[in-house]
Amino acid sequence: MNLRALYLLLALLLAGCSSAPTQQNKTEQVIVNQADDPATEARFSQNLNALLANVSQSQEIPLQSLESGFTDAKSIPSIRKLVLPPSGTFKKNWLAYRKRFIEPVRLKAGKAFWEENQAFLSQVEQESGVPAEIIVAIIGIETIYGRQTGNFRVKDVLSTLAFSYPDTPNKLAREQLFKDQLKELILLCWTEAGGKLPAKNTAQGVNSARFSACLNQNSSYAGAIGLPQFMPSSIRSFAVDGDGDGRIDLKQSPKDAIASVGNFMKIHGWQAGMPISFPVQDGGIAAAKELADGEPQLKYTVQELIDKGILTKQQGDLQSGGVEPTSKAFIVDLPYPDKYGVDQVQYFVGLNNFLTIVQYNRSYFYAQSVAEFAEALGYKNRSVVPVDNTSKSTNSKSGSEKAKPKKSSGKKKPKVN
């Protein structure tokens, strides 16, 4: 997702209630079909046609083929409202966010999804080093295993945000981001329909029905697609064919979704057998507050945080479930109002794997929710290292086997936070 996180910064994320995975392909979502006023639609069409001409020229795709896929494209007024930033009186609420995603219905669906895909999850875990609980947690938080994948046509979403983003301070930058995503969508759908890139000015071999179906598939109001909610650029860069049928289908194929999430996390630096985050010690809260700057960058060593009383010595010891004292970390601040409306903050120390989750969705709330969802499913948030690095004769497991993430036999399912 080329940093899918950045593309979804404007949206906390889609999610809703949970459902059993067996229902994921049966749930039909009504596609929103709106249109703007005539003047706005005219400007929209002019800008869209210019982009199509640009793609046609740069990729040598017949312009008529592109235009036929966008003849009914619309600017959707409600999308512009959905991406507006919250009002000035809005207060971030970690506890409310957590309650929304780490709840019994979603967890039950997660366990069912795990059971239905246990063998493949185990396979992906071995290949990528990403625990099954983490993968199940991400898909559960994103779409409840396919139940909530959005109800807008993706071409309408990306076209709307590319050419009529709301008047915000970052309007120009956001429009450029979505123009890029719209181009990525076109190229994704062209190749999915059998086309070559560059196309050499021919549509030979292209299934026009599949091209249109790809452009018209449902998405979130930010243009994210399928069970794992990948942006088009992320699909092209990180999605993989998990079920081996020769195509990538993140909406209908759980295996494609599972393998793609594992691949994304691996490429973005997931460290197998390492924890995600540590809670800040009560005596270190004041020090953590001073270091919290909202920037997801590994900047302090674990030893520095131990010296400040933010972490314990055990958290800097691999043999005790911690990490190397030279490992880098950063402070995660999760604000919430208490029952009296007074601002409070819960602090964690984010490690490398926390940062990897942030690459998936640039939100501390999201990343900590994934971690806690996974824990609720049985994930152990501690390092997994050999008990005795020097002893080989007394232990039946090899060092290479031990270096692998824990298997699902010791897990109960991904946890929701």
Regions found by a protein language model. Give the residues of each.
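Flexible, glycine-rich surface segments
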Residues: 211-330
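A contiguous strand-loop segment
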Residues: 38, 45-50, 54-75, 81, ...
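An acidic, Gly/Ser/Thr/Pro-rich helix-cap/linker signature
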Residues: 20-116, 122-125
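Acidic/His-rich structured neighborhood in mature extracellular/periplasmic domains
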Residues: 94-260
